[in-house]
């Protein structure tokens, strides 16, 4: 009797264990199914987000392609041969806006050409993205720095003067100086100018220029803001220095900010 009772208890325990195991298995299967479903939903959301981003990027590129930036043919790319023995290479970051390129970079190049008539003035851009964009959109070729230097060598230039239009002694300027050093043996004489904001006198000259150009707006009630791009390099300090020097000279309604660094737009 005791043996029969024990066997019944064992059988009951086995059934219970099997039932528990079955429930546990069902729970595991349910959990696995839920995880798989969640992962599928997340993957779908990520794919949708990527597709949306690609569509937005394509739309932005299409808008930019359709935006009229002016006639590219009016801009002198200054990548002609027959340079002569003396060249003045003007190096700029660059812009893909045709009218802006002609009225800013082009105007500087023209002014330099008038000031130094004994030199052939040529152009070099440091932004390959801009060079490629202009080429693709307008079929206009602009030399990068390497191409400009190679062109100078091929044309037998002996005296090369390089003047950047960069604002500060930052990463772009450092790269330029390094590339010139690597190619200096190709010329008899090489010289490179400094960025716009190098000495205190440079800051004072720029302050004089920008405040004179905007003095009609300095009525005591209008905030006059100048925005720069900004950089992670230490050279970004030029923006705060410009702000401080403006205040020191009594231009309390003048503000300096950057798009991607400090002073930020919120600071302004």
Task: Tell me what each language-model feature is.
Residues 51, 55-268:
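Active-site-proximal alpha-helix that buttresses catalytic centers in soluble enzyme cores
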Residues 1-10:
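Bacterial Sec-dependent N-terminal signal peptides
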Residues 20-33:
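Bacterial lipoprotein signal-peptidase II cleavage site
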Residues 30-58:
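Intrinsically disordered, low-complexity serine/threonine-rich repeat tracts
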Residues 14-20, 47, 52:
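Hydrophobic core
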């Amino acid at each position: 009797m005791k043996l029969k009772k024990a066997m019944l208890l064992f059988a009951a325990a086995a059934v219970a264990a099997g039932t528990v195991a079955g429930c546990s298995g069902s729970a595991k299967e349910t959990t696995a199914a839920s995880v798989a479903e969640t992962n599928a939903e997340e993957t779908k959301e990520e794919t949708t987000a990527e597709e949306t981003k690609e569509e937005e990027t394509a739309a932005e590129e299409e808008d930019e392609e359709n935006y009229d930036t002016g006639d590219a043919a009016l801009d002198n790319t200054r990548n002609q041969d027959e340079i002569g023995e003396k060249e003045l290479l003007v190096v700029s970051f660059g812009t893909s806006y045709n009218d802006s390129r002609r009225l800013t970079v082009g105007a500087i190049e023209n002014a330099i050409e008038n000031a130094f008539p004994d030199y052939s003035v040529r152009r070099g851009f440091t932004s390959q993205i801009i060079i490629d964009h202009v080429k693709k959109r307008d079929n206009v070729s602009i030399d990068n720095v390497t191409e400009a230097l190679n062109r100078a060598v091929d044309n037998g230039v002996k005296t090369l003067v390089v003047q950047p239009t960069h604002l500060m002694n930052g990463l772009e300027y450092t790269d330029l100086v390094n590339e010139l050093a690597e190619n200096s043996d190709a010329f008899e004489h090489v010289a490179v100018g400094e960025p716009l904001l190098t000495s205190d006198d440079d800051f004072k000259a720029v302050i004089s220029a920008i405040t004179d150009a905007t003095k009609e707006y300095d009525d005591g009630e209008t905030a006059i803001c100048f925005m720069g791009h900004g950089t992670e390099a230490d050279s970004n300090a030029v923006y705060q220095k410009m702000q401080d020097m403006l205040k020191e000279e009594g231009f309390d309604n003048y503000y300096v900010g950057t798009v991607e660094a400090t002073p930020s737009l919120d600071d302004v």
